[in-house]
């Protein structure tokens, strides 16, 4: 059995790590490189960095901090933010990232997924999906430009359909960002994860809702996700990654030590 991954998520805005609640009201957490270093030392399996306003600002993620992160950590990391071309992706990978993740640019140009997968290999192409449960319709809808509160909008895609579409186009991994749960620390949306898992045949990473160690165990044991991504519980030192791995091992979850 493959070990389950613990993945701290660092949202980057104006050169600093920030965290919001349900993708709004972001507060500054701290500097990028020291936080990355801390998580690597605590035992994180990999890191994910989202430049949350790059797409809505029409720019590519700032590559200077990508190089600095690569110098100080020895675990894989993934970078997202305004990657619209193969050239954009190549530069980020050259600066030291192991994977690139695309979200809003993939919605704007789905062919980009195939282009990147063909050029760099599916193993380093991640598609992030921001999924919102609309209580009025009872459906999970994909949203775009979620890093900018004023530009956030629903797309034509229902989550399950988009998950299937991105796989056809070459996504090597999917990060499911569950917007309703983001930052509220009440647990992952297990129902949604199981729905997506049914049609997802590449590694699936749960994102949004972790507040206690049991939430990670539930995600792994009840939905069979490959990794769990979290931010505020790590940023605010509510959960220590080493202690989390000890706990998960006791819950019969295979983790890297």
UniProtKB/Swiss-Prot annotation:
GO terms for molecular function: imidazoleglycerol-phosphate synthase activity; lyase activity. It is found in: Cytoplasm. Keywords: Amino-acid biosynthesis, Cytoplasm, Histidine biosynthesis, Lyase. Pathway: Amino-acid biosynthesis; L-histidine biosynthesis; L-histidine from 5-phospho-alpha-D-ribose 1-diphosphate: step 5/9. It is an enzyme of class 4 (lyase). This is Imidazole glycerol phosphate synthase subunit HisF. InterPro entries: Aldolase_TIM (IPR013785), His_biosynth (IPR006062), HisF (IPR004651), IGPS_HisA/HisF (IPR050064), RibuloseP-bd_barrel (IPR011060). SUPFAM superfamilies: Ribulose-phoshate binding barrel. IGPS catalyzes the conversion of PRFAR and glutamine to IGP, AICAR and glutamate. The HisF subunit catalyzes the cyclization activity that produces IGP and AICAR from PRFAR using the ammonia provided by the HisH subunit. Its EC number is 4.3.2.10. GO terms for biological process: L-histidine biosynthetic process. Belongs to the HisA/HisF family. The active site is at residues 11, 130.
């Amino acid at each position: 059995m493959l070990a389950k991954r613990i993945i701290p998520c660092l949202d980057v805005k104006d050169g600093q790590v920030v965290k919001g609640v349900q993708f709004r009201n972001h507060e500054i957490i701290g500097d990028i490189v020291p936080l990355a270093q801390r998580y690597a030392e605590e035992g994180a399996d990999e890191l994910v960095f989202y430049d949350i306003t790059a797409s809505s600002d029409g720019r590519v993620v700032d590559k200077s901090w990508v190089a600095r992160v690569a110098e100080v950590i020895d675990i894989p990391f993934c970078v997202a933010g305004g990657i619209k071309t193969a050239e954009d992706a190549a530069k980020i990978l050259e600066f030291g990232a192991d994977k690139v993740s695309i979200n809003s640019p993939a919605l704007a140009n789905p062919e980009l997924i195939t282009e990147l997968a063909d050029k760099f290999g599916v193993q380093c192409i991640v598609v992030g999906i921001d999924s919102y449960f609309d209580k009025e319709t009872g459906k999970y809808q994909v949203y775009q430009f979620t890093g900018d509160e004023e530009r956030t909008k629903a797309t034509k895609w229902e989550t399950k359909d988009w998950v299937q579409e991105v796989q056809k186009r070459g996504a090597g991994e999917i990060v499911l960002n569950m917007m309703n749960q983001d930052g509220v620390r009440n647990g992952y949306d297990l129902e949604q994860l199981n729905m997506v898992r049914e049609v997802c045949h590449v590694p699936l990473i749960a994102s949004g809702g972790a507040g206690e160690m049991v939430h990670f165990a539930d995600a792994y044991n009840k939905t069979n996700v490959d990794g769990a991504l979290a931010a505020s519980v790590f940023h605010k030192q509510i959960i220590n990654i080493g202690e989390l791995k000890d706990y998960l091992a006791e819950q019969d979850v295979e983790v890297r030590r």
